[in-house]
Amino acid sequence: MSKITKSPVLYIVLLVVGVWVAVNLFLTNAYQSIRTEEGLELIKSDSLVSVRIVDRDQRVDLELATPYKNHGTKVQFNYVSQRATEIVNAVNKAKIKDGFTDEVPAPSVWGSIISMLLPIAAIGLFLWFMAGPQAAGGRGIAQFSRMRSRLVSKEMPKVRFTDVAGADEAVEELQEIKDFLSDPDKYRKLGARIPKGVLLFGPPGTGKTLLARAVAGEAGVPFFSISGSDFVEMFVGVGASRVRDLFEQAKQNSPSIIFIDEIDAVGRRRGSGFGGGHDEREQTLNQLLVEMDGFDVKTNIILIAATNRSDVLDSALLRPGRFDRHVAIDAPNLQGRLKILQVHARTKPVSKSVDLEVLARKTPGFTGADLANVLNEAALLTARSNAQIIDDRALDEAVDRVMAGPQRRSRVMTDHEKLVTAYHEAGHALTAAAMRYSDPVTKVTILPRSRALGYTMVMPVQDRYSVTRNELLDKLAYAMGGRAAEELVFHDPTTGASNDIEKATSIARKMVTEFGLSKDLGAVKFGNAHNETLMGVGQMTARDYSEVTAERIDVQVRALIQNAHDEAWEVISNNRNLLDDLALNLLEKETLNQDEIAEIFKGVRKLPERHVWQSAPNREPSNKPPVKYSAMGPDSEVTAKSPKRTSNRRRLPSARRPRKDSETQE
């Protein structure tokens, strides 16, 4: 502020404003305003000394011989244009001592000069004020181009690698980055080149940002944290300027780490969407690519970025030499979930009777954020009940709230609706229990939650990363179990199976178009997925097959759904007594756990084994069993020797794809 007060520009502006105010005060007359009717009455009186009609302002100035009320001897009033003739006639008839004048005043020269100079001076002051941080104390336009990154200082609360659980591989990769920054000569002596960039990608809630914070806590070097959206501003060119400023700050504080969260906001593939080559984001991305190429080997600057959408990033950004290392951070496995629960349970009064491993088995597919939310919900429920210790009951309710939403106690169902819901959920549970490749049923309830009137929980015993054809067929049958029960018992199905039909149709279509599990169409991928964003729509699938093929796909999907419906009908028909028993227990208790369900289904009649999969008539399956595999641990090896290969051709590695989240049983 002292720089502003010392500048002569401020005093010049103040002088101009002062002169303008003084001139206006000088030119302002001392006439007091009165109402129009009062003015007309005064014109008719005998106390007028002089009258002046100002046509431009539609004003009449009166000078009186005696003061009028508290207004003195000089008064004025205004009139509308429609009464101009009336005013003139009244003045002509009036008895005025010095007569009257009618004038159109010329504009004031000083007023014109002041009115012209004042806006010019105001604009000049604004431009000077916004010219740069040196002239305006760092609040100018140039400040927009500066990077508002957060520099993590030593005094800030730190996260260590010990606080990160369930991502051991990612921690190992980032530990190497931290070691390089602290002892770069160790790697240079061996001719190793440390990666310039590390990309952390994975679904939301898996701990990407937490890992970056752990690097900041462990590295002991300046850590610049910024979001990808901070590069985009209202001014064109600001993004590229901020990229330059960010890397300049990092070079001045070398060795250092730059962390860009949600980099897909600025690193999206060029040419997608609107804007073309002149899009502001593309300019920012180009500058980011240039800066990453300009890294010196001895600069000791490492860029870490996190994103949920690595599939939309520009290929030039992902190539070696920029983001050399891509670290996938997926949902944790059983041991990872257990470690995460143990980390979050440190600061909460969890009962000693709680087995966190059991809780970890109940939450397959949960991310670190989901598990943290489970314990937080359990703590809130415990506090709501005025208890002091978090027990199994609170944790079970917390899991249900995270998975299916809170209970809808205000949703009151009729007795018939409860009966239909009980049979619907019993149909799901019974079909899942009678399938040979389905996961065990762990919970059934008819308590409304969120949009569902009830739900059946089917949880895998262990983590799996691929799904077999029989498992998918069991999922289809289990999904149609509720609809089959309604048809069999009430002969009048309801709309409650709409979500089940949607899920079953999605699985069946993927089996035909993505997984190659249709004998008629074979192992062919139908449909080409595009990740370009257009009008707010994310991934789109373009149809690259004919109308005839589309009809065949629909026929195969319908056949899979029909077969699943038939299997569910057969299971429920063969076990009608168990269906009635489970529905009755649900109506009495509303919620059944795994032990209670297993007791009811003790005598369930399983569905016969399906025919062996044969993709073509000429491809007879082998009767020779696979080699034996020892399941002693993750480091165990195949115990039986595999047959020797007679060919010297190099065998390519397998490219089995992990199971998507949408393929998990719900």
Swiss-Prot record:
Residue ranges with Basic residues bias: 642-659
A GO molecular-function descriptor: ATP binding
Known EC number: 3.4.24.-
Keyword line: ATP-binding, Cell membrane, Hydrolase, Membrane, Metal-binding, Metalloprotease, Nucleotide-binding, Protease, Transmembrane, Transmembrane helix, Zinc
Record: active site: E425
Topology, Cytoplasmic side: 1-7, 130-666
Position of the signal peptide: none
PROSITE patterns: AAA
Cofactor(s) it depends on: Zn(2+)
CDD domains: RecA-like_FtsH
Compartments, as annotated in UniProt: Cell membrane
Statement: the UniProt record of this protein carries the keyword Membrane: yes
Bound cofactor: record note: Binds 1 zinc ion per subunit.
Region (Disordered) location: 612-666
TM ranges: 8-28, 109-129
Amino acids binding Zn(2+): H424, H428, D500
GO cellular component: plasma membrane
Membrane topology type: Multi-pass membrane protein
InterPro entries per record: AAA+_ATPase, AAA_lid_3, ATPase_AAA_core, ATPase_AAA_CS, FtsH, P-loop_NTPase, Peptidase_M41, Peptidase_M41-like
Main location, first listed in the record: membrane
Protein purpose: Acts as a processive, ATP-dependent zinc metallopeptidase for both cytoplasmic and membrane proteins. Plays a role in the quality control of integral membrane proteins.
Subunit structure: Homohexamer.
Similarity comment: In the central section; belongs to the AAA ATPase family.
Descriptive protein name: ATP-dependent zinc metalloprotease FtsH
Native organism: Tropheryma whipplei (strain Twist) (Whipple's bacillus)
